[in-house]
């Protein structure tokens, strides 16, 4: 008897996890690979969770999450001007990944196509495939700041295209979609009757005066937009698994029924703590300022290394650096950098074909480790240039 089904056999370990597994066998490694804040969750949020435990808030919540939390998201988050109904248009999920998995489960029929940027965080592609959908790559490049071009998107739309995914600020590139580009994409979505899935998880991490407009705010878009977000990056709460979706009531209703049958609800103390966190936007700002400082350290350091080329990304906590001049594949470059200098970066090919020739560098470590990692990368690149 074969116990494992054919779909499960298609799931593979990602290149990111493979790099960490190799690094874990070594000592003295500096990781510029991890896609999460290195700091702990703010004490105020942790104290709120303890308060929830002391109050006995340890039971199931409604499948859609506590109403008080949904109300706080509707009234206190960046969505407040869009007037989402907390009763019918917001659901609390097990992180942003839990939100996406529920969404794809209720959205996709076999053969439905979703347009996804390349390079892009590849869990999107795996989840779409597992739900019988087809991920169609939208190529981007450094010259256009890794921003999807509306004319490229339109050429890829077919009768099977159901949705378009956007992620701004972006993982892995750190790029932020301009308001002008977003407006054109919104027009395309209306013209072709597409759903837009907007992964906003990095939208508090913006630098150099950058703004991150919400596509649901454009004409005709609220009724065709699914906003996915979480508290993981903005409040350093990756391990808490607290996310949410704001979307048309029909979609939220189906996601809620799906959540009831698959995992009941998000954890109750985490929902309580995240509700408190929304009263303290200064916590997000403290994280943002830290990452903006580190961004400057990293970009200034990379600018002094011959052979490396990159843009100045204004969001998230990544730099997507061009290492093609060294004549190595991105996997070869990262493996040798780890072996010879004990620095973890992620090969760009892990994020799609358009990522080949690049490496993702996350500035999610201390300033001191960042300076040391830059010294090691510089030594490594000088050796390659000889």
Regions found by a protein language model. Name each.
Residues 2-6, 10-11, 20-26, 30, ...:
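PLP-dependent class I/II
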Residues 56-60:
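A short acidic, glycine-rich active-site loop
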Residues 64-65:
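Short beta-strand to alpha-helix junction loop
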